[in-house]
């Protein structure tokens, strides 16, 4: 399959691994204090474990996991607010499949469905808009979440809802922005992050220039990388070369997909519908300044929270779970005392075990047998 098989070719992978090992000998880092590369995106984390790339690294390079999985950082209180709305008479509540099993204090949306709420899985926000048009006597709510990657689709759907005059369609906003989170991580004095592999999907929208502050203000090298083995390994080589040269630059490994300027049409749609401002709570990380997303005045009438006014929910994370430490690269999933026991894919305690892109789910799927051994 073109653009897939050639990026997974075993011979080329091993050649690149050997090149990485040779270059890593020039690093000042050791096995006791390796070069810590944070892969920000959950898709990167999944690919790293699926293909065993972390096991091919030289001993003085380590991948650490970041907060780039939007389902994984869903606060419990937001899930409870969704359940409140979904449980009301006459409501059809729509969201993506990953969000169905995220636990809140009052259970999950899947459990709310089992109790009688009309909760439905959709594959795009346009599916929810079609439901609203097909059911004019019902109030249809779309629970939209994700980083800049998914915001354009939501924005264009709301534009369509406005143009068509769909009065029974509402939007529960859990979109968040990635860059303030990276800044928040780097502002923590004990962050231990030496370099970044930045997500290709978000970068398709925002471009590469948006990451400039990481290199200029925090002096960390960053490479935007794709999701195949050769992409990730080449990204690691590029970060090693910058570290050897004592450079801190933003580079683009994923040029076949990501233009440096991003997607101007997607950026325009986001700017019309959303205000990228305000604080937002992230599960396991607390409140992060300037990471929130809100509807602009022209689209306020679609605001589900303003219409339904669910009771404010603020639920503290269970201190036994180490979700926040996993999301900031401070520990590995299997080092959490709940991993694989209280928290597993069949009965998830934390959101990182729910999403297919969650670090804990990836560890459980690809590393559990090694841990048991």
Predicted regions and their residues:
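Hydrophobic alpha-helical scaffolding
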Residues: 6, 72, 143, 147, ...
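A conserved active-site cap/scaffold subdomain adjacent to cofactor or substrate pockets
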Residues: 172, 190-259
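Structural motif
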Residues: 92, 139-141, 195
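Internal helical hairpin/lid segments
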Residues: 234-325
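Metallocofactor- and cofactor-centric catalytic cores in central/energy metabolism, strongly enriched
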Residues: 1-137, 151, 155, 159-164, ...
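Phosphate/pyrophosphate-binding betaalpha-module
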Residues: 143, 147-210
């Amino acid at each position: 399959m073109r653009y897939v098989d050639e990026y997974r070719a075993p011979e080329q992978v091993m050649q690149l691994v050997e090149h990485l090992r040779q270059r890593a000998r020039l690093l000042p880092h050791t096995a006791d204090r390796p070069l810590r590369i944070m892969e920000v995106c959950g898709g990167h984390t999944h690919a790293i474990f699926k293909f065993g790339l972390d096991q091919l690294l030289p001993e003085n390079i380590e991948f650490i996991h970041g907060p780039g999985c939007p389902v994984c950082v869903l606060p419990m209180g937001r899930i409870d607010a969704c359940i409140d709305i979904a449980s009301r008479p006459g409501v059809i509540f729509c969201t993506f499949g990953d969000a169905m099993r995220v636990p809140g204090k009052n259970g999950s949306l899947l459990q709310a469905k089992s109790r009688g709420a009309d909760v439905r899985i959709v594959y795009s926000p346009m599916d929810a808009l079609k439901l609203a048009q097909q059911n004019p006597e019902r109030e249809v709510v779309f629970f939209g979440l994700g980083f800049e990657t998914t915001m354009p689709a939501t924005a264009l759907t709301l534009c369509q809802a406005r143009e068509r005059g769909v009065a029974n369609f509402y939007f529960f906003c859990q979109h968040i922005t990635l860059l303030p989170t990276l800044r928040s991580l780097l502002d923590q004095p004990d962050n231990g992050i030496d370099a970044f592999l930045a997500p290709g999907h978000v970068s398709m929208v925002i471009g590469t220039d948006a990451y400039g502050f990481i290199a200029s203000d925090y002096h960390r090298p960053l490479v935007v990388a794709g999701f195949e083995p050769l992409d990730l390994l080449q990204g690691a080589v590029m970060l090693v070369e910058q570290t050897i040269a004592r450079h801190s630059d933003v580079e683009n490994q994923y040029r076949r997909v990501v233009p440096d300027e991003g997607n101007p049409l997607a950026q325009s749609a986001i700017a019309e519908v959303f205000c990228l401002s305000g604080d937002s709570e992230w599960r396991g990380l607390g409140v992060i300044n300037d990471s929130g997303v809100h509807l602009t005045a022209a689209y306020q009438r679609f605001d589900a929270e303003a219409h339904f006014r669910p009771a404010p929910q603020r639920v503290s994370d269970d201190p036994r779970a180490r979700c926040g430490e996993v999301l900031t690269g401070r520990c590995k999933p299997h080092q959490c005392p709940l991993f694989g026991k209280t928290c597993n894919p069949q009965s998830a305690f934390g959101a990182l075990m729910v999403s297919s892109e969650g670090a804990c789910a990836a560890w459980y799927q690809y590393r559990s047998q090694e841990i048991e051994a």
